[in-house]
Amino acid sequence: MGKSFSHLPLHSNKEDGYDGMTSTENIRNGLVNGEVHNEDGRSGDVSQFPYVEFTGRDSVTCPTCQGTGRIPRGQENQLVALIPYSDQRLRPRRTKLYVMASVFVCLLLSGLAVFFLFPRSIDVKYIGVKSAYVSYDVQKRTIYLNITNTLNITNNNYYSVEVENITAQVQFSKTVIGKARLNNITSIGPLDMKQIDYTVPTVIAEEMSYMFDFCTLLTIKVHNIVLMMQVTVTTTYFGHSEQISQERYQYVDCGRNTTYHLGQSEYLNVLQPQQ
């Protein structure tokens, strides 16, 4: 022992006292720190360290969780988390791709809607006179002529249309000799066609009674007269009404009952009599 102390420097009593106090405090601190480290090793729970906010030199306990690191129950929908603007969650990948895909889908749906809902024409085609029934009133010198015609109506739209009514009249020598109107006829499906037969009753009398002699003349086999047929078809779709009108001249035999072969006439039609 003496040999070991011979190498120690000599100090004053004051310094020796200070060193003694320092050594004692260091020993105590070492024991305290050792106990703390042992407790940390045993528990291994880091939750005992409070959550604090560092604001430079000082630190402030988090007011939300009160330093516990746990959010109070029932406040999950009331608290807002702040994240940096540069966080990748604010800039998800493929955003442009999703936006472009959404725009493309919207444009595609709009284009399809315009294509299928865009109004197209409704074609009215006269097929010909189907039959003509003739009767006479000899005393009144009157001719009764009922003309049945065939009309094709084609719907070129991708939705159904309603044929609301068909009106027609027949003129002979600039005089109206017959009228007819047919209501609530039928519905035509998308890209479909329907054929409609209708009859217009006509009367040739009074100032045109001279035609009675012509139509009953036995020396003539064919008693054709020229009649002007006027027809108007009214269709509706999506609350919109559309009218299609046509007029043509038709040869009709007023001397006998006649049945015609459809497709051989180039003239127009008329319809069923008004009620």
Swiss-Prot record:
Record's bilayer topology term: Single-pass type II membrane protein
UniProt region (Disordered), positions on chain: 1-24
Subunit structure of this chain's protein: Can form homomers. Interacts (via N-terminus) with MAP6 (via C-terminus). Interacts (via C-terminus) with the vacuolar-type ATPase subunit ATP6AP1. Interacts (via N-terminus) with AP2M1 and CLTC. Interacts with TMEM106C.
Major localisation: membrane
Keyword line: Cell membrane, Disulfide bond, Endosome, Glycoprotein, Lipoprotein, Lysosome, Membrane, Myristate, Signal-anchor, Transmembrane, Transmembrane helix, Transport
Organism of this sequence: Bos taurus
Glycosylation-annotated residues: 146, 152, 165, 184, 257
InterPro entries, per database record: TMEM106, TMEM106_C, TMEM106_N
Xref: Pfam families: TMEM106, TMEM106_N
Lineage of origin: Eukaryota, Metazoa, Chordata, Craniata, Vertebrata
Keyword Membrane annotated: yes
Residues passing through the membrane, by range: 98-118
Subcellular location(s) per record: Late endosome membrane; Lysosome membrane; Cell membrane
GO-annotated biological processes: dendrite morphogenesis; lysosomal transport; lysosome localization; lysosome organization
Residues in the Cytoplasmic compartment per record: 2-97
Disulphide bonds in the chain: 215-254
GO molecular function terms noted in the UniProt entry: ATPase binding
Lipid attachment, kind N-myristoyl glycine: 2
UniProt name for this protein: Transmembrane protein 106B
Lumenal side: 119-275
Annotated function: In neurons, involved in the transport of late endosomes/lysosomes. May be involved in dendrite morphogenesis and maintenance by regulating lysosomal trafficking. May act as a molecular brake for retrograde transport of late endosomes/lysosomes, possibly via its interaction with MAP6. In motoneurons, may mediate the axonal transport of lysosomes and axonal sorting at the initial segment.
One term under GO cellular component: lysosomal membrane
Family: Belongs to the TMEM106 family.
